[in-house]
């Protein structure tokens, strides 16, 4: 239906509102009409601001799925809706469509005023507010005229704390929710005010233009006078651009117009979407969805390919025997940036510039609007950067920080600081922004996205001359063989770069896409198995101790593959449980996750699990690793997780999980449906499997050169409970049928031949010993060999080498002869599974070394050795008396004891070797069985082997040495290993004297030398992380090992 046919003429209020909200901007109404001649006009004034949350936001939040996933609980009565049993997705669509339909009929076709409040984070036309939670908190404290040290003032300023001073707040991590609690106690209005959506937009435009508290405070006072507490809460959410209404921009855009998402992808403009696509029946032509000058677009991204060889990596690029060439570029550690330039005689220098980041943030204010912009950090230096024939262009590249003093790239975190400094002091040496260009997408009004990379590169080299260390074309290497990758990767390792990007020169530019035309390659680190995994959070577990009452660990899922969805076997949101993550989170990470998921968690009901969305290990019956609460994937967040390896596990529905997972960072830039899926996981698993086979092959080669010095560790077998599937159980022929039977039947079913008297521990004649055995169910034979033909196994018993025994040993050297001590030990053992006061005795023990008079085979001797520890103490049996204890203790030499100084935290054993208690193996087992060690400082560094790198001796006043000593103690306390060899380290900590230019220079020099040494290693060998001392400090402070990437040294 064509909405223009029903359009009405604007009434007086609508005309006044149009002038009010659009006439005070950077463009006048006449200029707006010139730019958008067909923009729609509303026939009536906009809805009250309260209608926005009463009929849209609140119903969306209340629209929650049932745990079974079939129907939904609709909006609460009185909040703009009614109860319904349609699907969650349909209910959500109906809420949004109903609001849009009402707007079109009651207000008009100009939906832009509402859309910019619904999607404030996508509104590029309004300037930035420059307001964070703490600043808004200070303003509200002054507006309400309360003491910032009062309970409410304190709660506003400390909104991340779990309850402020009173400990009763439920809005921990949610600043807007905390504002609602505080404002509701002293609101100027009980009911919503009269401000319309247009009025709020006008005030927000003023707020964005305001600079400093003196201009911001009167605007907040006006909001406070005219809004109630709930309106203020939603206003704060809009200012912070954090709506949390349970629907994404994709949903709103697609419901507004079928082409809205496509137009937004190439323009990043809500204004264009609303003003050009107000008629649902109007469709865009293909050329209208292409890139345009001075309109931000979504760039192409590089794919990460988890392959085992360079050959496979290159093959995935799509090269062929006929066209084997591919390109290799350095992956830069900076910020992805697109630059637009157009001729404009109205600005100094004749050319106008615009800069946007990958997330569509406008950085023109920072890098410059024109060649004559005296406040620019970059464009004032670009007078000779382009060929004279260039009228306009669009470039794609990376903005990095370059230190001109050392002529090297420095970490990305310094970029904005360097740019601000260059604005003030354009000729100053030191760090500066450098724009490295690698693609051109438009030249002299001609879009180039459909041209090949080869053609685009030729156009780039003709159009861009460059300015040294200001704007440069990123160099690349042409290659035809996979062998070309390794030496270049060595070089980027030595230069502390991020990695490489491989590109297919025959590929077109794919807007808003990530595919195999561009593939990134990163070096692997010792503590990880490669690229971090981006998984969607589907469940949460409440913590204890200092994390009590809050979610301290999270269950992550892997999305089902498209094949499952298309076949109808799973919903689009179905995830399989994969890993439980609790380590690596800072306090601010927990607060951020709470901030983005507040109100979306639901209690886990074992009787009605949400199987449409989450499948646990063990299915509905067993529900392994079931969380305390769960969340829909579409309502959740994506987190980046790294780990030591992948391992099989029936505890998770994937059948696999990560060993020792650790949180790396929150991926707010990734939607839930871009997180790891089953197909991507299978590629990863195949890579890890191939790498593991290669590693084992190398170990086997090394083992052939080196004879084994220790026998292999065997699993312990509980006496009387031998594994029926094992062919070499501890007691294959004497295991009892029922271990709980009375001792009078202890030897029932066993056959004995007593060959001599008993000497130890009890003296007993041969007849007396035979009677003892018969009294307890055993059968006595006078010959060892069975001539009955029944296949009986007869156990010879002897304590002296009498003639019969000597003859037997000579005739049958492979036969085992058992001492009477075994009979006595079995009889005095307490029966298992009985109470101590019942005093029931009698239990068949596995043979031990003291039970063997003669061992007929190596296998018997080994099994007997496995039944006791290295001191001879039985695993299955109690000590008989004090004499036996004394004998064991006398056999303990002083070398067997491990002092603190001799303990090797790396191996979890004493340095003297042996088969003693393996602590790391024990702790690993605990974690794999679900016991969390994340809160224990004494184990936080246990997988870290740390090499400390300090300035040369004689430099400084010993401050670096003192600092290193403290950091080493943190590592040791956390059960880490301080090593003296770089080759064995997982982490290298660079420690210099207190901050200053000289210490920064020392840090860079030390880090550069270390990276050069590491780059000489055999390619494929994992690398240690080279970090600053602050990594140890902050990890200690947070009580968990934090992500290393924020602390890169050099």
Swiss-Prot record:
Q: Which domain of life does this protein belong to? A: Eukaryota
**Family (UniProt):** Belongs to the ATP-dependent DNA ligase family.
CDD domains recorded = Adenylation_DNA_ligase_IV (cd07903), OBF_DNA_ligase_IV (cd07968)
- Using the record's annotation, list all stretches that form the BRCT domain: 742-840, 936-1049
Enumerate composition-biased segments (Basic and acidic residues): 691-702
Q: Which reactions are catalysed by this chain? A: ATP + (deoxyribonucleotide)n-3'-hydroxyl + 5'-phospho-(deoxyribonucleotide)m = (deoxyribonucleotide)n+m + AMP + diphosphate
* Region of interest called Disordered, as start-end residue ranges on this chain: 1-22, 691-711
Biological role: DNA ligase involved in DNA non-homologous end joining (NHEJ); required for double-strand break (DSB) repair.
Encoding gene (name) = mus-53
Provide the species name. Neurospora crassa (strain ATCC 24698 / 74-OR23-1A / CBS 708.71 / DSM 1257 / FGSC 987)
Q: State what protein this is by name.
A: DNA ligase 4
């Amino acid at each position: 239906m064509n909405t223009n046919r029903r359009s009405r003429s604007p009434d007086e209020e609508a005309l006044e509102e149009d002038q009010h909200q659009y006439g005070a901007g950077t463009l006048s109404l006449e200029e707006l009409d010139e730019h958008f001649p067909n923009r729609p006009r509303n026939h009536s004034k906009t809805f009250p601001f309260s209608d926005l949350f009463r009929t849209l936001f609140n119903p969306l939040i209340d629209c929650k799925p049932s745990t079974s996933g079939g129907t939904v609980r609709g909006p609460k009565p009185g909040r703009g809706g009614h109860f319904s049993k349609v699907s969650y997705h349909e209910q959500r669509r109906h809420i949004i469509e109903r609001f849009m339909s009402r707007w079109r009929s009651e207000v008009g076709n100009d939906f832009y005023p509402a859309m910019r409040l619904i999607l404030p984070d996508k509104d590029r036309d309004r300037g930035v507010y420059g307001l964070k939670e703490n600043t808004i908190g200070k303003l509200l404290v002054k507006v309400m005229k309360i003491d910032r040290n009062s309970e409410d003032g304190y709660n506003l300023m400390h909104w991340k704390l779990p309850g402020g001073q009173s400990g009763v707040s439920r809005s921990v991590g949610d600043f807007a929710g905390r504002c609602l609690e505080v404002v509701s106690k002293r609101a100027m209005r009980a009911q919503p005010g009269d401000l319309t959506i247009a009025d709020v937009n006008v005030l927000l435009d003023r707020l964005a233009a305001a600079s400093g508290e003196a201009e911001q405070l009167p605007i907040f006072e006006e909001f406070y006078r005219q809004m109630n507490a709930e309106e203020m809460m939603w206003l704060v959410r809009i200012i912070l651009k954090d709506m949390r209404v349970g629907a994404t921009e994709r949903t709103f855009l697609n419901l507004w117009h079928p082409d809205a998402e496509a137009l937004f992808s190439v323009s990043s403009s809500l204004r264009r979407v609303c003003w050009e696509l107000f008629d649902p029946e109007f469709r865009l032509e293909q050329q209208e969805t292409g890139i345009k000058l001075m309109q931000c677009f979504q760039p192409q991204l590089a794919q990460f390919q988890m392959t085992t060889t360079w050959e496979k990596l290159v093959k995935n690029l799509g090269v062929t025997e006929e066209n084997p060439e591919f390109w290799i570029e350095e992956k830069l550690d900076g910020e992805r940036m697109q630059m637009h330039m157009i001729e404009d005689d109205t600005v100094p220098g004749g050319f106008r510039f615009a800069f946007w980041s990958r997330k569509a943030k406008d950085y023109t204010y920072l890098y410059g609007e024109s060649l004559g912009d005296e406040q620019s950090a970059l464009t004032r230096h670009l007078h000779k950067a382009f060929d004279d024939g260039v009228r306009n262009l669009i470039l794609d590249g990376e903005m990095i920080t370059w230190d001109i003093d050392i002529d090297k790239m420095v970490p990305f975190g310094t970029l904005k600081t360097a740019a601000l400094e260059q604005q003030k002091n354009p000729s100053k040496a030191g760090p500066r922004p450098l724009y490295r260009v690698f693609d051109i997408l438009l030249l002299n009004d001609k879009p180039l996205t459909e041209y090949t990379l080869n053609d685009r590169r030729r156009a780039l080299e003709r159009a861009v001359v460059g300015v040294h260390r200001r704007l440069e074309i990123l160099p690349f290497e042409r290659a035809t063989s996979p062998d070309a990758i390794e030496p270049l990767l060595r070089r980027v390792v030595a230069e502390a770069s991020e990695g490489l990007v491989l590109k297919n020169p025959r590929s077109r530019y794919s807007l808003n896409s990530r595919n195999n035309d561009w593939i990134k390659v990163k070096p692997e680190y010792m503590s990880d198995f490669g690229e971090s995994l981006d998984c969607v959070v589907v469940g949460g577990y409440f913590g204890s101790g200092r994390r009590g009452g809050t979610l301290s660990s999270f269950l992550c899922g892997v999305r089902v593959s498209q094949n499952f969805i298309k076949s109808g076997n799973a919903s689009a949101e179905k995830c399989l449980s994969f890993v439980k993550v609790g380590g690596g989170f800072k306090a601010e990470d927990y607060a951020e996750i709470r901030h983005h998921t507040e109100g979306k968690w639901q209690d886990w009901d074992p009787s009605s699990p949400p199987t449409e969305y989450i499948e646990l290990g063990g299915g509905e019956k067993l529900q392994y690793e079931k969380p305390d609460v769960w969340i829909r994937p579409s309502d959740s967040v994506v987190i980046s997780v790294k780990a030591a390896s992948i391992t099989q596990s029936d505890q998770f529905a994937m059948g696999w999980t990560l060993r020792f997972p650790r949180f790396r960072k929150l991926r707010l830039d990734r939607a839930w449906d871009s997180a790891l899926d089953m197909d991507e996981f299978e590629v990863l698993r195949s890579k890890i499997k191939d790498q593991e086979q290669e590693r084992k092959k190398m170990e086997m080669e090394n083992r052939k050169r080196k004879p084994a010095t220790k026998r292999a560790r065997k699993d312990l077998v509980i006496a009387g409970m031998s594994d029926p599937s094992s062919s070499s159980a501890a007691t294959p022929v004497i295991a009892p049928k029922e271990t709980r039977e009375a001792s009078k039947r202890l030897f029932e079913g066993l056959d004995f031949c007593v060959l001599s008297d008993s000497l130890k521990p009890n003296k007993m004649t041969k007849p007396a010993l035979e009677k003892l055995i018969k009294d307890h169910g055993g059968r006595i034979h006078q010959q060892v060999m069975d001539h009955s033909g029944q296949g009986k196994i007869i156990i010879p018993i002897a304590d002296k080498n009498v003639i019969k025994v000597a003859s037997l040993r000579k005739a049958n050297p492979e036969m085992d002869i058992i001492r009477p001590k075994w009979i006595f030990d079995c009889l005095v053992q307490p029966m298992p599974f009985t109470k101590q006061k019942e005093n029931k005795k009698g239990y068949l023990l596995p043979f031990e070394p003291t039970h063997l008079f003669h061992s007929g085979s190596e296998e018997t001797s080994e099994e007997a050795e496995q039944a006791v520890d290295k001191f001879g103490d039985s695993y299955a049996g109690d000590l008989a008396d004090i004499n036996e204890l004394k004998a064991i203790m006398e056999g303990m030499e002083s070398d067997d004891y491990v002092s603190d100084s001799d303990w090797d935290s790396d191996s979890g054993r004493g340095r003297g070797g042996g088969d003693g208690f393996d602590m790391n193996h024990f702790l690993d087992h605990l974690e794999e069985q679900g016991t969390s060690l994340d809160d224990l400082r004494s184990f936080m560094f246990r997988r870290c082997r740390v090499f400390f790198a300090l300035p040369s001796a004689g430099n400084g006043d010993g401050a670096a040495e003192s600092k290193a000593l403290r950091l080493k103690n943190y590592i040791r306390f956390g059960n880490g290993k301080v090593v003296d060899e770089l080759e064995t380290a997982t982490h290298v900590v660079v420690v210099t004297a207190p901050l200053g230019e000289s210490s920064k220079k020392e840090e860079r020099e030390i880090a550069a030398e270390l990276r050069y040494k590491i780059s000489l290693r055999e390619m494929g060998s994992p690398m240690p992380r080279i970090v600053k001392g602050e990594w140890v400090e902050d990890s200690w402070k947070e009580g968990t090992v934090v992500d290393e990437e924020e602390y890169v040294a050099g």
